Amino acid sequence: MDRFSGKTIIITGAGSGIGAAAARRFGQEGARVVLVGRTREKLDKVADDIPGAQVIAADVGTEDGVRAIVDGTIEAFGGIDVLVNNAGVAEPARMEDTERDAWDKTLRINLTGVYLMTQAAWPHLKKSGGNVVMTSSVSGMGGDWGMLAYNASKGGVSNFVKALALEADQSGVRVNAVAPSATVTDMASGLVENDTLYGKFKERIPLGRAADPEEVGDVIAFLASHDARFVNGVILPVDGGLSASNGQPPLG
C-alpha cells in the first residue's frame, strides 16, 4: 500500500516505541516523514530505516521548540498533511509523593505540547485538508493507582481531541486519538519487565498480553489515512480489550 505517497507527516516522540513504529509504517507507505524528539541519536537510528526522513531534535513543550519543528518541516517539504502528537512522559506517584516539578513536566509535555504543536500546525493542516492523530491512553479514560499527573494529562488530551474535532465543520481537519494500554516500550519497561506486576496486568487484558508498538502504530496509520476519512473525534482503544470490562472480577 502507498496510502501516504507524497504526504508530509510529523511524528513527535519518534525516537522509540509507538512513535518509531508509526514512523516506520508511514515510511513504508510512501510518506515524507519528519521525526521529532529530544534525543537526536535515537531519531537518527529510526531515520536509517526511512528513506528521506527528516530529523528535528526539539522539545514540544516549548514555543521555541515547536516553532523549530513546524518551520523546519515547511522549509523541507512545503506543507503538513498529518500531525501525530505522540510525545509523552510518565512519572508514577501518589498524591503525597507527587512533586510540583514532576507534575509540571508531565502536563507541559503531554498536554501543553499537544496544544502548542496542534496550534502551530493548524493553518498548514487546514490548507492541506489534513488530520491530527494523538496518542492518548486508557489512562485518559479512567483513573490508575499512583498515576495522578499522567492520568490528568491524558484525560486532557482525550477531551482536547473531542473539543477540537467539533471544529471540523470550519477547519476541514479530522482529529482522533489512539488509547493504548500496556505496550512494550521503554516507558513501560518497569511494568513489562516486572513478572509479578505484568502478570496482574495480563489477567485484566482479554488478549492476555501487552501490545507491540507496531500494533499501535498500525492503528495510528489507519486513523491518519483516507480509509478513516469519516472518522472524527474518536478515542480508539488499542488495549486488547482492557477497557471493555466494567471492573468486576470473573464470575465463572
Question: Which positions does each model-derived feature cover?
Answer:
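Conserved glycine-rich cofactor-binding loop
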Residues: 8, 15-17
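Short, small/polar-rich loop/turn modules that mediate ligand/substrate recognition or access, typified
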Residues: 84, 169, 174, 231-233
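Residue(s) in the substrate-gating loop at a strand-loop-helix junction
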Residues: 137
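Active-site loop immediately N-terminal to the catalytic Tyr-X3-Lys motif
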Residues: 95-96, 142-148, 170-171, 208, ...
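Alpha-helical segment proximal to the catalytic Tyr-Lys
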Residues: 123, 166-170, 229
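Substrate-binding pocket helix/loop in short-chain dehydrogenase/reductase
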Residues: 94-95, 102-104, 201
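Active-site helix of classical SDR
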Residues: 118, 153
